């Protein structure tokens, strides 16, 4: 990943400040080390709030544990409630990645998406999901719907790739190559 150095934190702050200055309410998808930076520095959340952007966070369980200051076990016991509560508290759209992904919006909407397979639990798969959501969010005005569509298409791509290659042999590039096919 990009890392969590002071330089990276300054870069994220600069991006968020530019959003604030622009006055445009653009969707922003945050994943991986951006989430780790948010977990470590509450002031970054204030910038996301000031930006007015539709912030979409895409953590896996361990990243969400750091963001929400809870344990993975606590999340497993109460995923729906914690996801919804977090989305409301942080005014973000939360995409909680797992075998069944939960998408929660600050307005209380929740979508449960049991699509995909364990072959998708590979480095780079989350990057494909982030890009998929970002691409859809750039075209839709409803960022919650964009996140749900992105998760669904990503999962369908994974299912198609698994049928062709098997779960154990899947790579992120297989997900990308099947995205166009699931859109037809």
Protein language model features and the residues they cover:
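Short, small-residue alpha-helix embedded
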Residues: 66, 122-153
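Short pre-catalytic strand/loop immediately N-terminal to key active-site residues, enriched for Gly-Thr
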Residues: 111-124
């Amino acid at each position: 990943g990009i890392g969590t150095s002071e330089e990276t934190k300054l870069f994220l702050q600069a991006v968020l400040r530019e959003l604030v200055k622009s006055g445009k309410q653009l969707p922003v998808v945050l994943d991986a080390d951006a989430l780790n930076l948010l977990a470590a520095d509450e002031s970054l959340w204030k910038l996301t709030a000031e930006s007015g952007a539709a912030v979409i966070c895409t953590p896996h369980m361990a990243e969400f544990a750091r963001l929400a200051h809870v344990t993975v076990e606590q999340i497993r016991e109460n995923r729906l409630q914690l996801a919804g509560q977090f989305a409301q508290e942080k005014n973000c759209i939360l995409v909680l990645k797992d075998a069944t992904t939960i998408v929660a919006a600050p307005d209380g909407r929740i979508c449960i998406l049991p699509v995909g397979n364990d072959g998708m639990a590979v480095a780079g798969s989350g990057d494909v999901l982030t890009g998929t959501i970002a691409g859809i969010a750039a075209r839709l005005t409803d960022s919650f719907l964009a996140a749900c569509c992105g998760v669904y298409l990503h999962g369908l791509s994974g299912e198609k790739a698994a049928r062709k290659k098997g779960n154990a042999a899947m790579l992120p590039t297989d997900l990308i190559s099947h995205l166009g096919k699931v859109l037809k």
